[in-house]
Amino acid sequence: MFSLQKKALQHIYMTPENASELSKDLLQHLGLYWNGPIIKMDTVVHLHNKIFSNRSVLKYALAKQANITIIETLVLWVEPEYALAQALKHNRKDVLECIFSYHLTTPKYHHIMHLTSSQELFEFFHLFICKSKNYHARMECLLYAATLYNFQNILEKNREYIIRHSIGNPLFAIACKERHINLIAWFVTAGVLDTYDDSTLFNTAFKLGDYSLLEVACDLPITYPDYLIISMMQTAIQKNYFRFFKKLLTHFSIYRPIIITDAAYYDRRKILLLLLNQNIFNNFTILCALSAAIKGHASKKTLNLLINRLDSQMTVIDSVYYSIIKYNNIDCIPLLMHIKTFRMETLISIAVHGDNIDIIAACKAFLPKDTLYHLVLKMAIILRNHKLFKLYTEKEHPMYIFTILKAIISDFINYTVFQALAIEYLCKFHQEKQLPIVPLLMVLAEHNYITKFKKTCYAANMSDQKVKRALIKCLFIATQKNYCQIFKYCFGSLLKVLSKHEQEKFFNSVVFAKKLASYYDHQNMIQLIDSLIERFRYLLKA
């Protein structure tokens, strides 16, 4: 509440006698030669038929360092906050004292404290606006304000207090947030921090995107652990802060595979180029980066950049193939084919294993049909992927698939388990499609599957001339490969179904088979043929 005297001062009339107290400069600025009163009317001053705002008159009076008596009157004509702000700007302690003497219940005006450049005035002003009766609360409030508004000399003056009461860390956090570079350096070097967290300054620099903060962090006399710098590099890559990354790389010279891998994954081509130009990373690391780029669906330019840096003889690692399939990155396949050691067969094998139909379909553009089907069906058999086998066989010509399966069975010549599995698939497919029996007999004889051979013969029409000719061919195959059981079964089966005339020709074939066995030096087969001829000679003579 204003006293009556203060209320009267707010509506003061300045007579010509008082005018002498106004500075000559102020009167001239107002365009007056004094001959009348100054009259305050609400928010304006009426002076010799001219109107000026109360604020402009006060501002000019302070700038011209007018008499305190005049200013004491003018400050009552404006809002307290404006009067305080102007007094702070002009570093007028006497004006502040005047205002505070009038306004005993001053609100908190912390937000205008920064308007002064004087440490003394800053502390004096804070003394009045901080209403806490507790000394420590007032001190902490002052130090927080000094940090907020960058008054380093106040902090230096109260260094011991900061250390004693352990408030260095929260003050340091404020300095980082407000980007007061000089304060940041002071906090770190003045020994006022309880426990300095190395990441605080870096994290703040990245959060605010402030390069100058990062420079301060790098230039501080602190030995940072490698893991922290690597973490900051990864953050720079994620945020695509090239300047930040370059500063960290050149200042600390830390090169780790995880850095180039992250750059590839996030498709940061400028950072990748910077790293690759150092000629530090080996082929294996670049391949890992390539795998990460595929995983992150990086651009073609990024993939080409990595591929061109690889040694042409470097074997492509499995993680590259797995990345293509797992993350379904079809677009990278034609680019990878420029690598000499890239194998489509390996890719298809892994794709079949992962049941990735899209990748298999995409490979059609890069492989001949026969090769693709051979690889797909081969892997489908190995993995017993019935669904994929059916998908790639149901729409094709049965004999085309049969031919491919024959080739696959031959591929498994040294893998008995897989060959037996392939034979199972072949027999089942043959039965489903009702194919001619002859080709199946030939395959079974060639690979010595006697049990299935017998079953197939049992199901065949043995009086059919094609079947008879097939059995004779199987006889020669058995002779050549020394398959005694197949030979014996073919011999017995043919004797049962051949006519007298056919038996004579058959005997000539058996004699030729013996010569063939002698050529290959299959003694067991020679003995078998001799015993069979001796045993069934009576039939042949008859």
From Swiss-Prot:
Induction entry: Expressed in the early phase of the viral replicative cycle.
Pfam families in the cross-refs: DUF249
Organism domain of life: Viruses
Keywords from the UniProt entry: Early protein
Coiled-coil residue spans: none
Entries under InterPro entries matching the protein: MGF_505
Similarity comment text for this entry: Belongs to the asfivirus MGF 505 family.
Stated role: Plays a role in virus cell tropism, and may be required for efficient virus replication in macrophages.
Protein name: Protein MGF 505-11L
